[in-house]
Amino acid sequence: MAFTWDNQEKLRILQPETEITISQATSKYTPMKKQELYHKVIDYFEQTMPVAETELHYNNPFQLLVAVILSAQCTDKRVNMVTPNLFRDFPDPETMAASNPDVLFDYIRSISYPNNKAKHLWGMANMLVNEYHSEVPSDLDQLVRLPGVGRKTANVIQAVIFEKAAMAVDTHVFRVSHRIGLVPARCTTPYSVEKELVRNFPAELIPKAHHWLILHGRYTCIARQPKCDACGLVMICKHYQNQHKLSAQPCPQTGTVHNKSKKEKGQNKS
């Protein structure tokens, strides 16, 4: 559940020849309707992140599939370091299928779990050649049959390549969705988060929303010590409210004043 401010007090700020009145939020909140919350989130990201795309480097569907398989529990930056040589020598399913896992391993040894991923790449390439005419399928059930491809990877391919209303839920999407109240606390699995997001985002925005949430989680709403000062969603963020209960510091985006948290009070003792 997200929140808006209620039970407001007045804080007066004097400036030369001007008296400005702004709202001071207290600890009492009222629920925000779900669609209102989603509209606020969409408006914010449309303004701050009008272009939101995958950071993986690729030139065709096969290369994106390879890159996404490699990105499991690995950073996009690391994947982008190894794929140029890999794509140079194995530009398509046929050349990769004609190789073997041991050879592929040498190209991806700096990636997490290189042994398993080398086997997955080789198996995936063989299945594409033998069963799908060397084409990456668009159907979810066909995609998840490929070695190394789970629901998350399949949804990335569907959204990015085929522009389908598919929401891939990784750790960033999961974290951000809960923090800003896009999904209820009962959504404890990636699948339940996926269904809730797909249900509430407009279908045409789902592929873009996937990247909004990933990039926001990767660079701003990070797992530890999120950069709340750089975030325009703190007013609807449950995590921010929980961390700043009884805080006497102004909200970074609005100037709203809260009392200091117990942790902050302890740090300020002389």
Pin down the residues of each PLM region:
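Catalytic cores of DNA base-excision repair glycosylases
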Residues: 29, 33-250
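Short microdomains enriched in Cys/His and/or Lys/Arg
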Residues: 242-270
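Short, positively charged and aromatic/hydrophobic N-terminal segments
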Residues: 6, 13, 21-22, 28
